[in-house]
Amino acid sequence: VNNIVAARPQRGLSKADILFEIKVEGGITRFMPVFTDYKTVGEVGPVRSGRDQFFRLILPWQALYIHEGQSVVMQQYAIDYDYGKLNNNDGANGYRDYGRVNWAGKSYNAGSLALEHTMYTNADNIANYISSQNVDMNRTYNSTFFNFVDYRLGTTRDLSNSLDSAYSDKYGPVVSDGQYIEIEHSQSYKTRFIYDESTNEYKMQQNYSDGQWRDTVDEAADNKVLTFPNVIVLYTDIHTYPGHEAKDLQYVEYA
């Protein structure tokens, strides 16, 4: 899902079970909302092209990956792993909302918003794609996406010797309570999460081109502010793929 400033606000993000934000080319970020059940997606977008840093996260789960267009690296990954029809490259027959108005009052119909900020898809389109292409969506998973401690056992995990402990001195204690989290993806793209004790959730905000922080909202859900019970920040190396400097395609080191 597009997250360049001009594309905001997005649709459908509040229904995601997991929302990933990762830096891509040019210092911008994009979102990948992950849904357990595609029937609950509603409308989602603006849909943009696929990148391998997102694809590699969902690859072990054999999830349906929907996007519009893809980088050459992403395309090669899909070929190498024989992802077939699970890699959808047209937004599940995505459609244009030429009249959508962004946060700054700009629209494609008014000649002030680029075309790439206007594509959306929805649960019906996804269902039609799955049905018409006979895509196998049956999965049996033996674990969750992240390996959390089972809260029902009342135990904690000793992280003192974990790989994350290397970040303790620089970024603060790994397991401390977080009232405020700010992530600087690049000089222009920053995200922060503010903890609300009354709800036990974090409210998401993003920095805009005018220097102001604004709530991240889902305009398909009456501008509902995105909130999360858990925020996970993954520290890793991100750099340009050798040979892809012209388009600044980013490689994310996951292992």
Residue ranges and their predicted role:
Residues 1-20, 25-255:
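A surface/extracellular/periplasmic glyco- and lipid-processing/surface-interacting theme
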